Amino acid sequence: MAVSGILGKKVGMTQLFDEKGDVRPCTVLQAGPCVVTQRKTAAKDGYDAAQIGLVEFVKESRLNKPERGHLGKNNLPPVRLMKEVGIVVDAAASEGNGDATKIGDRVLVDIFDGEKFVDIVGTSKGRGFAGVVKRHHFRGGPGSHGSMFTIAGSIGSSAYPSRVFPGMRMAGHMGNARITVRNLRILGIDKNENLLVVEGAVPGPNGRYVVISKAKKPPRERRGFSADTGPINPLKASKRLIKKKS
């Protein structure tokens, strides 16, 4: 399967212990199963992509008429969520010998076999109307008597500029925004349950839907650091290299 991403749901956070005994905070994601509902091609649409739907129990009456028609013409089951993800065009497809991605194909968590990092797009938790101290980490006013503790301060002088500049950090709605977290390390894959375990936090509360895709810019291995084993002692590494050469 040439699809580069999958739809999923945040299950929750837990922790794992690596070989050294260190604790690694991780997030468990329900990745799929999904089905390809539409195929975009460069010849017809100007770009290559696949529209996939998350196969989850949903009443057909919950879908609107365009969605029922879109899925019904290809005899596809009702899906909870539909998103567009990129695909990798195979060599056979580029030569005109056929396309590996077709409508009705299943997309499972096994698309991340051999991958070390993923990018995750989700919606952060909504915090409601928040002040500048909570929203922008302002210091606030002095703690003496008669002062406003969480005051924002001046937002613009009266003489000049006589206006508030665009983008001024002020109190307002906080959270409930689209957040992209890049290069989360994959710690485990459960193909039977379609579970994906990644290191670190994922935006949003438990049960919120996310888009999981292969890392666009995976980190390079720095000198003296291995992505699998962690920091490397350069002295011991050089001694091992000398032994191999001898």
Model-predicted segments: where are they?
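Extended basic (Lys/Arg/His-rich) segments that typically form rRNA-contacting surfaces
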Residues: 1-246
